[in-house]
C-alpha cells in the first residue's frame, strides 16, 4: 500500500515540513561522536568487535548511565501523556512478522532463531501490534495508546550497511516506541499527535529538530503515510534521522485480523488502523545529545529534565 500525499521516486524527493528550535553552530570544532564518548571513557568498540563483530558496542560509566537515563525519561514522558507502558516479548512468531511487514523488509531486517518459529524483533512495534492478532475490539476500548521499551535487533542488509566505528547504524540497540490502534476515522489525527510527541521530547532536551515528509517512492510497503524526525548535528551541520512516524492504515490489521465491533451495530465488524512512532532510540539520540550539549572545554551539559535520572548531575566532565 502506498498512498502518500507527496509523490516522488525516492528519499531525495522527501520534503521538509517544519523546523523546531534554532540549529546550534558552535565556534569550535565538534568531534566525532565516538571521540566524545571516548573522552568520558564511555565506549569500547574494540572489545565489542572481538566478542561480536562490527555493529555492536560496550557502553560504560557516565555514557551508559546517560543512555539509560534517556530511556527512563522517555518512558515517563509518554506515561505522562496518557500512554500505557509495556515491556513486550523480544521474539515473535513468523505469522506475526509477516503481518507487520513485507517479505523484503523481513529478509533485510529480521534475525531468525535457528530451528524455531521465532524471530528477534527489529522494533517493539512488531510485538505490540502482534498483541492484537485475531482480536475483536469494542469501539469503546479504542484508541489503544501504548508505549513500549525493547532492545531491537537488525541485520541492516542493504545500501547503507553497518558502521565500522560508530553507533548510528548498528545490529543491536534499545528504543522507546509509541503504538496506537484506533478507529479508521481517528488515524489521521493520531498521526499528527505521534510525531509531535517526538518533537516535544527532543525539544525538552534542547535538541533542534525538523520533520520530513516521506514521498511515495520512499514509503516502505504497507505504509499509508510516514514522516521522519531528524535532529540537528552541529558537527555535520545538517539534520540526520532519529525517528520515524508511520500510519499503516488497515494494512497490518487486515493481515493480522485486528477488527473492531461497531457500538451502534454490534454485528458490524471492520478493520482497525495502526500507527507507530519512535519516541527515542538512544544510540542516535546520544549522538544528537552529545553534539548539541557539548561545551568548548569538552564537558557536556545535562538539561534539567534528565538531571533527576542522572543522580542530580548537571554536567559530564572528561575523565
Q: What residues fall within each predicted segment?
A:
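Short, small-residue-biased leader/transition segments that mark boundaries at the very start
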Residues: 1-3
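Short, flexible active-site-proximal loops enriched in glycine and acidic residues
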Residues: 5-6, 48
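Extended amphipathic alpha-helical scaffolds
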Residues: 6-25
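TRNA-recognition modules of translation machinery and tRNA-sensing kinases, especially anticodon-binding
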Residues: 19-319
Amino acid at each position: 500500500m502506498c498512498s502518500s500525499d507527496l509523490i516522488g521516486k525516492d528519499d531525495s524527493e522527501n520534503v521538509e515540513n517544519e523546523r523546531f528550535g534554532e540549529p546550534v553552530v558552535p565556534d569550535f570544532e565538534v568531534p566525532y561522536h565516538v571521540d566524545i564518548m571516548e573522552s568520558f571513557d564511555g565506549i569500547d568498540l574494540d572489545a565489542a568487535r572481538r566478542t561480536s563483530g562490527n555493529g555492536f558496542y560496550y557502553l560504560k560509566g557516565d555514557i551508559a548511565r546517560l543512555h539509560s537515563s534517556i530511556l527512563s525519561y522517555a518512558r515517563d514522558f509518554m506515561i505522562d501523556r496518557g500512554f500505557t507502558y509495556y515491556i513486550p516479548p523480544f521474539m515473535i512468531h513468523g505469522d506475526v512478522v509477516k503481518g507487520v511487514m513485507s517479505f523484503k523488509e523481513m529478509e533485510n531486517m529480521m534475525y531468525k532463531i535457528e530451528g524455531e518459529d521465532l524471530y528477534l524483533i527489529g522494533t517493539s512495534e512488531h510485538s505490540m501490534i502482534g498483541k492484537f492478532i485475531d482480536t475483536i475490539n469494542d469501539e469503546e476500548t479504542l484508541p489503544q495508546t501504548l508505549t513500549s521499551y525493547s532492545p531491537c535487533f537488525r541485520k541492516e542488509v542493504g545500501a547503507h550497511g553497518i558502521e565500522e566505528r560508530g553507533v548510528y547504524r548498528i545490529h543491536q540497540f534499545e528504543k522507546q516506541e509509541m503504538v496506537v490502534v484506533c478507529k479508521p476515522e481517528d488515524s489521521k489525527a493520531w498521526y499528527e499527535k505521534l510525531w509531535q510527541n517526538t518533537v516535544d521530547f527532543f525539544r525538552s532536551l534542547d535538541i533542534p529538530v525538523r520533520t520530513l515528509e516521506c514521498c511515495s517512492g520512499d514509503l516502505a510497503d504497507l505504509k499509508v503515510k510516514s514522516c521522519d524526525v531528524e535532529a540537528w548535528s552541529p558537527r555535520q551541520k545538517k539534520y540526520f534521522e532519529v525517528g520515524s512516524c508511520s500510519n499503516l492504515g488497515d494494512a497490518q490489521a487486515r493481515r493480522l485480523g485486528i477488527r473492531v465491533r461497531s457500538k451502534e451495530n454490534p454485528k458490524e465488524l471492520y478493520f482497525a488502523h495502526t500507527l507507530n512512532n519512535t519516541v527515542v532510540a538512544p544510540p542516535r539520540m546520544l549522538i544528537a545529545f552529545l553534539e548539541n550539549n557539548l561545551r568548548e572545554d569538552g564537558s557536556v551539559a545535562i538539561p534539567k529534565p534528565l538531571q533527576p535520572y542522572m543522580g542530580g548531575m548537571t554536567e559530564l566532565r572528561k575523565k
